[in-house]
Amino acid sequence: MPRMPDSSSLFDELQDLATEQQNPHSTHIDTASVEEILRVINTEDHKVPIAVRRELPHIAEAVEIVVEAFEADGRLFYVGAGTSGRLGVVDASECPPTFGTDPERVQGIIAGGREAVFRSQEGAEDVPERGAQALKGQGVTENDVVCGIASSGRTPFVVGAVEHARDAIGCPTLFVTTIPREELDVDPDVAICPVVGPEVIMGSTRMKSGTAQKLVLNMITTAAMVRLGKVYENMMVDLRRTSEKLVERGIRTVMMVTGVDYDAADAVLTRCDGHVKTALVMILADVEVDEARRRLDATDGFVRPAIEGDE
């Protein structure tokens, strides 16, 4: 079994982390009223989007890397532990119903495996080699992208995965953390570092750090999917109609974009197996199913040029 780090050196390392500092604005919350506790949390939460905004140039770099990988049939792997790992799993699991992607396209890997999504697996994050093994288990190749997520920037499972991806696999690497960039030990292709400051509860990185990570992951996958033609105007047009809500959303989308009524939208969607993009092209370009599909194939799934016949 790999040797664990010396406890005294780990103590020294942790006490200096930005995520482990005491927040001077919340030291009184153990004696505060409920409303004051909430006010303190809300005030601190307002700092999160500002910190994320400062990282937009780096997030844009990450999006370009992900888009390039997707265009080459590559995949995106989020790797995290605890809250960070769960956030990766959540973002990955939402891509298929939202954007119609294959579940393999964006995947979340969490230290401790599936059980850790629902219940903390203490110690699962402490061995770097396990991160590397997790990537091997998923068959990660140089065509994929590995994105580590760790509030502290030092979680061994995550660092081990990112270093293995960079050095052994040779694929692009990203890292999302909430410590200053200069304190990051790992060297990814792109580091995204929204520094949100000490947590309201010292060290509870499920709070501001987790919120910042969720915003960043939302941006990465959403912007990438927009660039891949998964959105028309600001609407989901590649959604999978896997629930009653999504069936109705598909009909409503066709109605809103084309101006047809409910029955007409439903009828066209029935003719094209419920595919919203095809329905839009059929109605707006006044073509039949086969021609609409041909146009979408010719434009790599982008609706606007398919409607205009700009192939």
Curated annotation (Swiss-Prot):
It catalyses: N-acetyl-D-muramate 6-phosphate + H2O = N-acetyl-D-glucosamine 6-phosphate + (R)-lactate. Its EC number is 4.2.1.126. The active site is at E94 (proton donor), E125. Specifically catalyzes the cleavage of the D-lactyl ether substituent of MurNAc 6-phosphate, producing GlcNAc 6-phosphate and D-lactate. Belongs to the GCKR-like family. MurNAc-6-P etherase subfamily. A lyase-type mechanism (elimination/hydration) is suggested for the cleavage of the lactyl ether bond of MurNAc 6-phosphate, with the formation of an alpha,beta-unsaturated aldehyde intermediate with (E)-stereochemistry, followed by the syn addition of water to give product. This is N-acetylmuramic acid 6-phosphate etherase. The gene is murQ.
